[in-house]
């Protein structure tokens, strides 16, 4: 399995809805609202790096009110 953390910047006052939408995506293991530079953080997993890339680019980044993401791929 391939694992990553995804950090999200979202539109103001949309955190709760985006969190709900992120948690509904297959491959998302956990997700939380956070304080600081980013608004949400999620831990994701996929069988391959290709699937991990698709999970981020075709699903998570397409959620309404997501402005930017930062993906941290775990290596150990």
Task: Outline where the language-model segments fall.
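A compositional/biophysical signature of low hydrophobicity enriched in polar/charged and small residues
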Residues: 1-76
């Amino acid at each position: 399995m391939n694992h990553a953390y995804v950090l999200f910047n979202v539109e103001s006052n949309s955190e709760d809805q985006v969190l709900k939408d992120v948690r509904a995506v297959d491959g998302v293991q956990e997700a939380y609202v956070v304080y600081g530079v980013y608004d949400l953080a999620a831990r994701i997993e996929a069988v391959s790096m290709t699937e991990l890339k698709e999970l981020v680019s075709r699903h998570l980044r397409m959620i309404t009110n997501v402005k930017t993401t930062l993906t941290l791929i775990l290596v150990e």
